[in-house]
Amino acid sequence: MLSQKHRLSKSADVIKTTARGRSFFNPYFVLKIAPATGTEPAKLTVVASVRVSKRAVDRNRLKRIIRETVRPSITNFKSGNYAFLLKSSALKLTAAELREQVTKSLIASKALKA
């Protein structure tokens, strides 16, 4: 589980991130990144709507996998707000494949500190 300081939990912040953030597309999710001002820690949220799956079990599984993939390295993220918007095609992936896709997207988006 992500620590409280690394969670993007306010609805207004999530809306700002999804509306104004830079988009990095992937067949399985969209990564939105909104840079923060100052030295705030990186904050993350994972959004899985009912369009992804009607079953909450499936949506929560995907969210857990992404959060646990990011958790060990979130202190190495550049300051900003990060939102993963899941697509229904992510259900077809195994946990290892989804972790690999998340890692590739973070590297491609240059979200990690040098």
What do these predicted regions represent?
Residues 1-114:
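Positively charged, solvent-exposed patches that mediate nucleic-acid binding
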